[in-house]
């Protein structure tokens, strides 16, 4: 079997050294996460954390087989008890999210339930700790919102401990008759030694428990509900069975209360008989000392927020609350995952099979996530936008996260765009999106972050120690970044010199009005109606310009000119910034807009037809019908893609074409609204059109924060450089910035949520809830912090 190498040479699909297919062979260079800066104190300080973003509240360590903790609770729905555990986008929890989180050792979250408010706080302490990673505490505040007649209805919380390595967990002696302070559970692990979990509360609590021996933590809420149902059938009481299986590695503790309650749960490790200061350690992690510690962390969070973003004198208190929620939820959404991606690899060229995949090597990923309820896993192009915010808060976290992603690169320079690692991540994704295709890329947004870091060094934003760490990181990262660019510059190249197109569009489907381009990140944004190799995508061309220019900057900054690199980055960047060539390929003079090019007709629509399946079954389905012959042409859809040359500042400041872009941006009949810029022009034939029977419009009109941020960034740029249009750019910039901030704050005031995207006509939040991936960029818009080019 043979395949095309990144250089265009024919190479065996099997790597000679390992006899593994190349697609699942790691890139042969030292891993970034093995750098000394990520070891020692740094590694230990980040060992424990709220690294289970898919849970309403969960704690784990950054190790594959961790001791994990989590919280569940019961609510009544349609007269039946329902367990809250995994974050759900569809349930009727009013709102939830981190109000504060520093990404390291502190976070405070509020969850607004039907008749209850839960506040969960997490804090770590190294004072007196002997175990690796330190001690930590959880505080759960329960506030019932019931009236006097209902107040006696119990609130049922379920706190659990589970050992993923199936090490036995020991039940505490006083679980059923809690004292002021009681041991819930204990055990021993190789990483942290002997450990104990203590519960302390001044309130009257009723407790029950059950223990399970199973590696299946994903279905824990189901096991608990089965136990509750069985007990209710026996006794009529909604309580756990107070029993456990032999050698249980999971214990669930039911904590019931009818009053307002504060529950402190402390984890201590590294316990040795000769160090009998347990009472002092527990006291320092509970009660008044815990209150003092949480207040200290709260004050420090606010101080750092002011230091990083300098907003206290610029914005009103309501807007500041949203800014803090943006960074708090971004940092609180950082997760740790471990597992193996599934990579598409056809077993036979003649027939498709569900087994047409190979497993990537076992890998860990430390990353932020776009949305805890909808997308609690790593997405490659999202992560670049995430880190534009995070590096300003904690550059060490950014370096490690970017390093984690680059370490996922295979020998050909490809990185899977969506990371589904481990059973918990797998449980939260539709089956059709699990397998990753090695022909498909994703925008190289990580280079936006790396450019920012280099510019930060040039403008002396970092101290000497951090500067040295960034330089050390870039020195090791360069060979991987070089391979990544090489993969793009060969696998995604078009027919014409200087042209590119996103591979992976379905050219045989008749179920989509316009075949999606998932690899572009813009999914259903309209492209050429009939995908083929003649396509030219203006957004990818601009991403490649960014990549080439970034690599050239890194090469010059790091003095890498004396080493062998695969590309002449200076020449490629010059080619892709050639304004005349760009206009020849993509500019439509009639509309004053940059457009894709491809085999296209506007004469397509979805129609209902009766379809006979292979088994003889007859069904009525929406299928695409084409009524006009497609031809090679510019694709007449104005929207976010049209503004990429503007976003990447390829347009000269004195060009009349810049004036045309400003007119398009500010035209209320095109993409302008009082809430932000629309993803697709109102004049487009596919504006707000369904792409299939079940695919609602996604990037066909809705307002998305990442693209608004990039456009706003360039408006800011063009407003500050010399040129005939700078005052016009400034006026548009100020109004767009004001519209975006006002709308996000208004929605947050009404719903307590930052949303995935916003409605194009009303500005209401839509899509995934708690989308504090790139929607959190609203904080950088507030602080007017933009990437430099």
From Swiss-Prot:
It comes from the Eukaryota. Keywords: Glycosidase, Hydrolase. InterPro entries: 6-hairpin_glycosidase_sf, 6hp_glycosidase-like_sf, Glyco_hydro_63_C, Glyco_hydro_63N, Glyco_hydro_63N_sf, Glycoside_hydrolase_63. GO terms for molecular function: Glc3Man9GlcNAc2 oligosaccharide glucosidase activity. It is an enzyme of class 3 (hydrolase). Residues 1-24, 512-531 are annotated as: Disordered. The active site is at residues 523, 756. Pathway: Glycan metabolism; N-glycan degradation. GO terms for biological process: oligosaccharide metabolic process. Its EC number is 3.2.1.-. Belongs to the glycosyl hydrolase 63 family. This is Alpha-glucosidase 2. It comes from Arabidopsis thaliana (Mouse-ear cress).
